């Protein structure tokens, strides 16, 4: 999917200047060009300003307009730029823009886009114009960019901002719009329009049957700049009403035929409004997930219904954990309804009642039980930009305190049901939980089992020899291509590289394993150096699944065990995750290196389980000894990843990162946390509090979350039963700690 997107970023484009690029590209509303200071050279100052043209790929064809805005250029050659592209039907449906930093060296301005695969652009002068190149693993394109005097000429017209309902009656998404086959929504509306407005009453009708959503064209935009309509594949879903709730019968990933995207439907609401022509109204939240990555887009849907018919379905998407494609979608799709029985209906109704009964209590951020007002509660998110954050908060003594459930169209009205693509947080909430459950069932010795005894290793080297389940979970298998020195400055040199993206595209388990085993061998033994790679976690998932089948029979499935024996006892009845799709269409093994889309309610339940040592309602669900080790509550401290915090090295062990922290009484802790691509964090604090932030702005500092948690409840006082032990010892003098 990312390789496809990379191609779309530049595409195959026409001869430079062949199209009118006026109003074709999005530009930041706060964009400004600062005249170069007098202490810089004239050669550097020439780059300042706005430049535009169209791109030409090696293969020819029509493609996008491109705009470069050099906002600042400094005397040392560093520059701040905005890079923007328009649409090119049919390959590039969405204009996009990025801010980036670059540098002019030997007359060439070079910068990388802030995307995981780091595509590179260069510009150099060719007469009075700029000759540009764009390169990544999928694209090689050139352009001739001319100077544009007026920045406003190239900026696309912005869609109007959303506004919340202003009166006591509905003036958006009204019945006439919903019932008309020709309605074309003009853009996003405020999320409140998907919920009851004005005087409402209980639903006049009930739903029990099958909804069929038909194929449609959906509009979309990036940063208020409209793109081309895109096709949305239809699907069929059984639903029923339960009191004021609308409940989908299937809560796993639904993949419409021929679509690379999947959908997860969640429970919504039903009610009646006086202007709905005697019909009832429903809305529900859903999430769109990708076929190969863990990106997730949160949407809302609404429709009218009576006992026999439904209106069109109005949908919109206005938030995501998908930093490479932060776009809005909206539209209306035809829909039909067939009343009738639902398979396993009695169980589904009973299960939904239990799900609601076991919901984690939720309170607003303002209700935090802090002992005194502190700046750290306000600074909880550190340098994370609010628009980048989907949801954030803390879990205290089994209660959720939520700071925000944010979208670009207003607060998400189904905050509890909002799902988040958490990427590598899955390595803990998926892979580690699975191995800890196996250890509780079959003994802690499963951590010492060898990968090669359960997976056919096709590597041409001995790097996998004697690698244990624990080594794989700790990312200390001596396997990889890049970062060949022990002192390599980044622990994940192979992630987000061309070979990794080829591995992502593999559909079946065997294809994925075979591609993973093409990685080379490092010159050190297992268990000594962290080389973080999701390929290793997937190999562990395959080994764990094979081990479970050996113990429980060929019909056993690793993720079913996790859901049935860990998640469901906690009250998490639905936790869809990404699986391999085998050649016969059957569900394969779970990926577990990424793929989970948890809600904040799920996170509250799971972090509470971890904070309580793997015990729930008097039953030990996870191995207590191995969980304590994973949470840095024993003498085991894992391996340094050669990244420093102000108190020492970050470390990694059994899927948990840790950062050293020293309290004011000079007690030293290793704070365990989970980290996922884009800025997804779950932090387990030593006072029993857990903090979370799901975002896609690539911000990585969690210290403000730790400081806020300590402000709520000091780390050096007694925590509730089941919370971790207190400080692990006094820190040495000098204000810092060494070596983790």
Cite the ranges covered by each PLM segment:
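Active-site Gly/Thr loop motif
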Residues: 574-581, 632-694
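Noncatalytic N-terminal accessory/assembly modules of large enzymes
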Residues: 154-298
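Active-site helix/loop module of the DD-peptidase/beta-lactamase fold
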Residues: 159-183, 192, 440-480, 518-523, ...
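Active-site SXXK
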Residues: 421-446, 472, 540-544, 603-606, ...
């Amino acid at each position: 999917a990312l390789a496809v997107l990379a191609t779309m970023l530049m595409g195959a484009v026409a001869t430079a200047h062949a199209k009118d690029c006026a109003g074709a590209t999005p530009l930041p509303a706060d964009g400004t060009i600062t005249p170069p200071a007098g202490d810089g050279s004239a050669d550097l100052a020439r780059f300042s300003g706005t430049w535009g043209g169209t791109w030409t790929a090696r293969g020819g064809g029509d493609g996008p307009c491109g705009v470069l805005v050099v906002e600042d250029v400094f005397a040392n050659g560093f520059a701040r730029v905005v890079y923007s592209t328009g649409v090119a039907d049919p390959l590039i449906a969405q204009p996009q823009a990025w801010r980036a930093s670059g540098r002019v060296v030997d007359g060439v301005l070079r910068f990388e886009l802030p995307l995981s695969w780091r595509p590179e652009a260069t510009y150099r002068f060719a007469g009075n114009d700029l000759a540009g190149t764009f390169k990544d693993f999928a694209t090689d394109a050139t352009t001739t960019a001319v100077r544009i005097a007026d920045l406003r000429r190239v900026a696309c017209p912005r869609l109007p901002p959303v506004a919340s309902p202003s009166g006591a009656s509905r003036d958006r998404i009204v019945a006439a719009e919903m019932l008309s086959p020709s309605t074309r929504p003009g853009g996003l509306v405020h999320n409140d329009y998907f919920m009851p407005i004005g005087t409402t009453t209980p639903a006049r009708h009930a739903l029990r049957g099958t909804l069929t959503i038909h194929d449609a064209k959906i509009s979309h935009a990036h940063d208020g700049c409209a793109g081309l309509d895109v096709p949305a594949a239809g699907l069929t879903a059984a639903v029923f009403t339960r009191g004021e709730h609308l409940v989908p019968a299937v809560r796993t990933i639904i993949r419409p035929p021929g679509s690379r995207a999947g959908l997860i439907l969640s429970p919504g609401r039903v009610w009646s409004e006086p202007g709905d022509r005697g019909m009832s109204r429903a809305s529900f939240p859903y999430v769109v997930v990708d076929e190969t990555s863990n990106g997730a887009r949160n949407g809302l849907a609404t429709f009218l219904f009576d006992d026999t018919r439904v209106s069109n379905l109005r949908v919109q998407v206005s938030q995501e954990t998908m930093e490479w494609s932060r776009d809005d979608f909206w539209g209306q799709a035809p829909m039909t309804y067939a009343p009738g029985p639902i398979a396993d209906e009695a169980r589904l109704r009973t299960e939904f009642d239990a799900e609601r009964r076991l919901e984690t209590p939720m309170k607003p951020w303002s209700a935090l039980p802090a002992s005194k007002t502190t700046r750290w509660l306000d600074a909880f998110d550190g340098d994370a930009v609010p628009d980048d954050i989907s949801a954030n908060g803390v879990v205290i003594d089994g209660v959720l305190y939520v700071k925000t459930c944010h979208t670009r169209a207003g607060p998400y009205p189904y905050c509890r049901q909002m799902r988040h693509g958490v990427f590598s947080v899955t390595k803990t909430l998926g892979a580690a939980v699975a191995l800890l459950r196996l250890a509780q069932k079959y003994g802690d010795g499963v951590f010492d089992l060898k990968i090669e005894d359960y997976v056919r290793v096709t590597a041409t080297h001995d790097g996998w020899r004697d690698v244990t389940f624990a080594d794989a979970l700790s990312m200390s298998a001596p396997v990889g291509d890049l970062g060949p020195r022990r002192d390599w400055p980044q622990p994940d040199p192979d992630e987000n590289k061309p070979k990794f993206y080829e591995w992502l595209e593999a559909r079946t388990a065997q294809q994925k394993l075979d591609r993973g085993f093409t990685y080379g061998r490092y010159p050190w033994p297992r268990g000594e150096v962290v080389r973080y790679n999701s390929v290793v976690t997937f190999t562990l998932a395959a080994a764990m699944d094979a081990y479970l089948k050996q113990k429980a029979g060929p019909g056993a499935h690793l993720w079913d065990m996790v859901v049935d024996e860990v998640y469901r006892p906690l009250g998490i009845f639905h936790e869809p995750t990404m699986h391999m799709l085998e050649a016969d269409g059957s569900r394969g093994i779970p990926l577990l290196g990424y793929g989970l889309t948890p809600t904040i309610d799920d996170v509250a339940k799971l972090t509470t389980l971890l904070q309580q040592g793997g015990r729930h309602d008097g039953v030990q669900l996870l191995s207590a000894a191995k969980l304590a080790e994973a949470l840095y509550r024993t003498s085991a401290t894992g391996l340094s990843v050669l990244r420093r915090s102000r108190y020492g090295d970050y470390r990694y062990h059994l899927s948990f990162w840790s950062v050293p922290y020293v309290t004011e009484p000079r007690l030293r802790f290793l704070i365990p946390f989970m980290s996922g691509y884009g800025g997804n964090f779950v932090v387990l604090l030593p006072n029993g509090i857990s903090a979370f932030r799901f975002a896609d702005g690539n911000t990585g500092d969690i210290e403000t979350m730790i400081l806020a948690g300590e402000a709520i409840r000091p780390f050096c006082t007694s925590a509730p039963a089941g919370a971790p032990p207190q400080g692990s010892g006094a820190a040495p003098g000098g204000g810092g700690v060494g070596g983790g």
